[in-house]
Regions:
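Cap/lid segment of the alpha/beta-hydrolase catalytic domain
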Residues: 1-47, 53, 75, 80-83
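C-terminal catalytic histidine-bearing segment of alpha/beta-hydrolase fold enzymes
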Residues: 2, 130, 137-175
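Mobile cap/lid helix-loop segments that gate and shape the active-site cleft of serine hydrolases
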Residues: 22, 66-67, 72-111, 138
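Short beta-strand immediately N-terminal to the catalytic nucleophile in serine-hydrolase-like folds
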Residues: 44-46, 71, 116
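Residue-level signal for short, function-critical loop segments
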Residues: 48, 119, 151
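Short glycine-enriched nucleophile-adjacent loop
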Residues: 51-63
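Short beta-strand/loop motif that positions the catalytic acidic residue
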Residues: 109, 115-117, 121
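Acidic catalytic loop of the alpha/beta-hydrolase fold
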Residues: 120-124, 154-155
Length: 175
């Protein structure tokens, strides 16, 4: 997994945290030295596990993060390839998997979310994003989604998706 023991001490069976308190502290410290930074307009982007993490920012820290773009996120580690998830979540699958699932926690979403996914993603099954979409609808949470037909993992790198992400952040963070 090529990560330090300190990283694993925080994130072991806890991908929902993934160091958010530290990241928020760093952003606040940077803003203290750079008054041009507006902490009322913080966005986050991530792809794959970073997509899971970007959405989690709005679930666990929606009081800080205002908008997120999640590209091809593995939103529930119970439906992803187990060899990858075991590195971070352990085996066997237990209650901690459900607690860390964006799908089971979607009702806690605060802020503006854009989900991007590729129709032909062979790394993270698109059903992971569909599961989150279903949970968001059931929780009556607003969100945007962009499907890139014919695209695989990393659909957000498509030129059309790049423009849509920029538009999303401009709309959501500039008002």
């Amino acid at each position: 997994s090529n990560r330090s023991k300190a990283f694993h001490d925080v994130c072991w069976k806890n991908l929902g945290d993934s160091g958010f308190p530290d990241r928020i502290a760093w952003i606040r410290a940077a803003a203290a030295e750079h008054p041009e930074m507006d902490l009322s307009r913080v966005g986050i982007w991530g792809g794959s596990a970073g997509g899971q993490n970007a959405m989690r920012a709005l679930i666990a820290h929606g009081d800080f993060y205002r908008a997120a773009v999640a590209d091809c996120g593995c939103h529930d580690n119970r439906v992803d390839k187990i060899w990858w998830n075991e590195q971070w979540m352990g085996w066997p699958v237990g209650p901690h998997y459900e607690e860390q699932s964006n799908a089971t926690q979607a009702h806690r979403l605060q802020g503006d979310l854009m989900l991007i996914w590729g129709e032909l993603d062979r790394n993270v099954d698109p059903s992971s994003t569909l599961q989150v979409i279903d949970a968001l609808i059931k929780a009556d949470r607003d969100f945007e989604q962009l499907i890139i037909p014919g695209s695989g993992h990393g659909a957000a790198s498509h030129p059309y998706a790049k423009r849509r992400q920029a538009d999303f952040f401009l709309r959501k963070l500039n008002n």
